[in-house]
C-alpha cells in the first residue's frame, strides 16, 4: 500500500475528523465533522486509507493508524472499541471481561461480544482479531459497568456478572 504525505488542507480535514470521532470513523461521522455529503466523506476516508493514514476495518468503518506504525495492515489497536462501533448495543463479557477484571491469567485471542442484534455470522475476524458474537434480549443488558477505552465508553460486565455468566 503506498504511503504518502498529505497536503495542508487534507491534513486539516483529517485532523478535524479525528478530533470529532472516538476511535472508529464511519462516512457519516466524517460527513458530520466536515459538513460534506456522505459520499464525498467516504471518498476522503478511502483516499486517506490508500495513503496509509487510516486502516479499513470493513466497508464503512475505518480506524486511525498510529504515527509510529510502519504499516496500516497491523492488528486492531483496541478491538473493544471496534466491537462497540459495529455491534452496539452490546457489551463485552465472558472470558474477555474475566481477563479485564483480572479473574484469569490466561490471555485470549478472541473477544466475546454480547449484542441485542441478530448477527448472520457468530464469528467474525477483522484485521486478525476474532470476535465471537452472542445474541441476547434487551432484558439481559444488566450488570454492566462502563469503562473508557481511549475516548469511547465501552460496556463490560461487572466482576460479579462476569463470574455468573461464566458459571452458567
Predicted regions located by residue number:
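Residue-identity detector for glycine
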Residues: 4-7, 23, 52, 60, ...
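Catalytic-loop motifs flanking and including active-site residues across diverse enzymes
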Residues: 90-93, 159
Amino acid at each position: 500500500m503506498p504511503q504518502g504525505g498529505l497536503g495542508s488542507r487534507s491534513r486539516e480535514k483529517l485532523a478535524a475528523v479525528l478530533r470529532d470521532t472516538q476511535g472508529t470513523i464511519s462516512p457519516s461521522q466524517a460527513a458530520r465533522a466536515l459538513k460534506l455529503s456522505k459520499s464525498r466523506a467516504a471518498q476522503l476516508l478511502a483516499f486517506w486509507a490508500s495513503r496509509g493514514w487510516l486502516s479499513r476495518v470493513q466497508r464503512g468503518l475505518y480506524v486511525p493508524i498510529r504515527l509510529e506504525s510502519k504499516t496500516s495492515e497491523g492488528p486492531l489497536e483496541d478491538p473493544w472499541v471496534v466491537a462497540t462501533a459495529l455491534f452496539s448495543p452490546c457489551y463485552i463479557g465472558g472470558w474477555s471481561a474475566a481477563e479485564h477484571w483480572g479473574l484469569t491469567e490466561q490471555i485470549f485471542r478472541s473477544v466475546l461480544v454480547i449484542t441485542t442484534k441478530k448477527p448472520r455470522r457468530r464469528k467474525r475476524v477483522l484485521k486478525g482479531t476474532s470476535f465471537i458474537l452472542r445474541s441476547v434480549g434487551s432484558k439481559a443488558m444488566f450488570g454492566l459497568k462502563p469503562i473508557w477505552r481511549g475516548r469511547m465508553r465501552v460496556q463490560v460486565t461487572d466482576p460479579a456478572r462476569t463470574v455468573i455468566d461464566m458459571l452458567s
